[in-house]
UniProtKB/Swiss-Prot annotation:
Spans annotated as Linker: 319-458
GO MF assignments: metal ion binding; nucleic acid binding; poly(A)-specific ribonuclease activity
Main enzyme class: hydrolase
Subunit structure and binding partners: Forms a heterotrimer with an asymmetric homodimer of the regulatory subunit PAN3 to form the poly(A)-nuclease (PAN) deadenylation complex.
GO cellular component, one term: P-body
Compositional bias (Acidic residues): 443-452
Domain notes: The linker, or PAN3 interaction domain (PID), between the WD40 repeats and the USP domain mediates interaction with PAN3. Contains a pseudo-UCH domain. This ubiquitin C-terminal hydrolase (UCH)-like or ubiquitin specific protease (USP)-like domain is predicted to be catalytically inactive because it lacks the active site catalytic triad characteristic of thiol proteases, with residues at the equivalent structural positions that are incompatible with catalysis, and it cannot bind ubiquitin. It functions as a structural scaffold for intra- and intermolecular interactions in the complex.
Gene giving rise to this polypeptide: PAN2
Annotated protein name in UniProt: PAN2-PAN3 deadenylation complex catalytic subunit PAN2
Domain USP: 459-846
Highest taxon, organism lineage: Eukaryota
Alphabetized InterPro entries for the sequence: Exonuclease_RNaseT/DNA_pol3, PAN2, PAN2-PAN3_catalytic_subunit, PAN2_N, PAN2_UCH_dom, Papain-like_cys_pep_sf, RNaseH-like_sf, RNaseH_sf
Protein's organism: Chaetomium thermophilum (strain DSM 1495 / CBS 144.50 / IMI 039719) (Thermochaetoides thermophila)
Amino acid sequence: MDADWDEVTRIAYPAPGTNDFPRPATAVAFDPIAELLWAGFDRGRVCSFYGRDLTRYTAFKIQPASEGPVRQFLFHDKGVIVLGTRSVHMAMRRGPALWNIRHENMKDLRCMSFTSKGTQEIIVAGWQDTMLVIDVLKGDIIKQIPAQHHYSIMKKSRYICAATKTGSVDLIDPLSFKIVRSWQAHASYINDMDAQNDFIVTCGGSLKQQAAQTYMLDPYVNVFDLKNMASMKPMPFPPLAAHVRLHPRMLTTAIVTSQHGQMHVVDIMNPNSSTVRYANISSYVKLFEIAPSGEALVIGDADCNIHLWGSPTKIHFTDMAIPIELPEPEEPAPVLDWSIETPLSSIGLPYYREPLFSAWPADIISDVGAPPLQLEPSFVATLKQAEWGLYGKNTRNVRRNQVEDTRNTNKQSNALQAPKFLSERARESALSSGGDSSSDPQVDQEPEDPNEIESLKPEAPPLYRNLEIKYSKFGVDDFDFGYYNKTRYAGLENHIPNSYANSLLQLMHYTPLLRNMALQHAATACVSDLCLLCELGFVFDMLQKAEGATCQATNMFKALSGTPQAAPLGLLEEETHVPSLATMAQNLSRFLLEKIHNEYRTIPPISTALEQSLFNFPHPPTPDELVAKVLATSAVATIKCMNCRSETTRPGTTHVIDLLYPPPKTAGRGGRASKVTFSQVLKMGVERETTSKGWCSRCQRYQNLQMRKTIHSVPAVLVVNAGVSNQEHRKLWSTPGWLPEEIGIIVDQGQFFCFEGEDLKLHLQRGIHNITVYSLIGMVINIESHSPQKSHLVGIINVAHAEATPPGENKWHLFNDFSVRPVSAAEALTFNAAWKMPAVLLFQIKSANNKSNLDWKTNLDTSILYKDTNPNTEKKTYRTLDQERERPGPDTIVALDTEFVSLKQPEIQMNSDGERETIRPMSHALARVSVVRGQGENEGSAFIDDYIAIREPVVDYLTLYSGITASDLDPRTSKHNLVSLKTAYKKLWVLLNLGCKFLGHGLKQDFRVINIQVPRAQVIDTIEVFYLKSRLRKLSLAFLAWYLLKEDIQLETHDSIEDARTALKLYRKYLEFDDAGILEAMLEDIYKAGRATNFKPPRREDREKELQRQSTPPNSTAPNDCGAKPDGNGNENGGEPATPARKTGGITAPTFGAVNVFGTPSKASSPLPK
């Protein structure tokens, strides 16, 4: 290392995607053949960089993101060999793959090395019991070798030097692959190793504290002499050696690096003398490598930076570098003399062997011209004849000479037309002269023929197609969801990530047993951040309270995204490698049921009286007993070796049944193939007799193993994955009446029997066997649409089984995200092989239909309202409730306000008219929640003021509007006690289910970001009570506070406690005006004053100047209870509108009992807004 060596180039690792963050590299290597530096990352990504400037050259993936990081590079004349966790990949240097090898014995690969055959053969190993030898030229595995140890690092010298995970180094013969010698280099592990010529150098760590299991790097580098097969004197390195490399040119020189960037150039024969350099890094060194030329080295740090070191005048990577292939520059188009006389044939066409893109298939219809405009006969009758045609009064509400696109109009007649925005409809209704809006053509009409089955059509009809939410400048709240849903069953919005699961959530919600379990668990004291069972309970409660309004499962999907197992299982849309949504829904159903099984057992439920009587338990069931009875299929699997006939048994439980279809059979001579029923397919799926290859412990080799199941019990909720994978399966489902609405199941002596139709009726009449009848709750359906429509999932559910009282008839409904409409049973149970196939089916025992356990509402765990997890006793902005004296209930009013931050900026594009069109609105996250007492002696005092710990990246803290800064939400710098979103949400959810009334200003947006559904009877919104519908404008909190309360709020920023208190004072004003009978007059005065100030409170400086010009200054005032000030005549509300004496008497302070400090105001003093 010459004296002029320094950092030459520093670049940041590229991000794996546009919406992702850069990640540290997991492997780096210099190419010995080309002037390239290669880097591998944790999601299977590989990048290469060219020259001293590290210009990005190529990038590609070697494996799915879920399989882990890139481990190591080796280089061949024909390309680069990359080692992944479960695969080995070889690619050309410009990117195209040469081969990719995957094998069942590749479980956790860590290292690889060339063998005695040079670069024609490699051996790969890892933390696994098998090493594999690969022919590089053929790309095949030619040998498998049992590994005596698990290896982490391999280097090739005279021997293959392999470092084990326990701190030793094995010298492996590169020809026979046998261990020649072992050397214990370090006590615990080896962090880095290099081998060249006659030397091996290692640095590692040792266990320093046995009790605490604390490891520390060793302050030396061990050296082993391969020529004499003996250890040499260690090289001391006080800064703790993290990485080491032997110099490729100077045979006895090593470069040692610490984690903090201190580098020593040491002579192995004279370790006491060294040259020291310091790398300028802000974190710690993760990777270190030296170039084959010895004239460059690279450092990779934890801050995702690459540091290239070398001499600025001599730096190069390899001595005999081959030139790299660069993209060929595009040839400029030839200049043509293009004029009217130029024949098109002079352009010519290139020679081709494949069909051109312009050769469209004959089945593609091209639009030519447009159909004539269809005029109403009544309109034509009013026209008058002239020499040049007909003329008359324009009564069609179109502009003169306006061209109408009749082609697109006819096309849209076959689809669900998007409704008008709510603001647009309100404006049109207000401006219409007659006020008659009944002629709106966008009314959702029922089909003319109710007996028509839409599922028999060759393509997906409009009611099954994918729906999109349109956004105006007012955001998603301006979209008319009611246009798509005129039932009392709530839909779910589909513009949030992972909303493919909407149909599965709806299906589980209308299964009474699952809904009971989720709500019982949510009502307990569980505050686990990633408890999906709690989130399911919150979603089910929202859907129940919505009464037809559209909901969203944002918090549920956030918890799902935060679950570590979700991404590897392919359950997340943004990271999935699963080929279809149907497969994702099936995987999600299995995952959710396992989570329910595990999480339900953690905390005993509120009450199990209903389940005890339903399942005839002799005692109150434990959580384990109940969840096993509801969800688990208990069976014993018998595995038989077809060679030695030995049998082994293995008990187990499953939560989901995968249907197993029989192989297709051809009809015999003169006969028909036997009919396959759903019951037979279900039986095969439950018992599942299969034959596959497996290890036989008696034969000590792989043999054909036959497995069959002996069924002991089936659950009360039967979740079935359809597993439709070929055309034969589609034909079965397309058979009319193939799926029954009821099935009967008998489990007798390990045998599973299933009956349907007439067979089921016959067994029920006989009454010989104990048969359990199951009702079909519903299905998740995969709608396979073609371009431009996208394939998606819908739910078809019989909601009659979830009603509080049995309706006496089936009530099938189609849940297409936020579109909900009733369908007939024939429509629900008819499938189409072309576009409508089931993905998940759900059955429940018939005796559990319409059984809702509502005990959780009366036994709700409210301890979270009285717990204070804030360790700071000083400067608290709130005081928690007193458990002895403050007990919220149905008569309690609480004032609520929240603050948000932005997670994603809105996506906006320009349409063909040059107007800005919102594709995706801004995405918000809850940052602060404040709840203020609305009654009692502590009225106006906050009892909740939570700041939320946000896991997602925040793009804008909206400080001007929220008062939130980056330091408020950073756990390292925040002066507030940050809580999880689950904790803050559960406090509000408990208040909601205690019956409290939420008071605030513009609560609709608060509830949307909180993701909670509050019934109208529990909402008091001051933006609605001080609103005139005829004015089409809602008033801000700051303006109302200035005009009615004479208070200036939100001067510099927002504070949620201040806003909640102000809303509470405004509500008290509203009660005064309403009680005095002057509410309408006051609203007119407010709007009149708003027009004079543009509905904004005047600035304080302007008002002070106005007061200085008055001849008589106003008297000093003192605030009263509502923030009002008396004027000079002794009247209250000095400068504000006076409130005359009430007709029914003054406001009486609420009386408080010995327990409820919140109090119960009289009905006359607290009417809800109408």
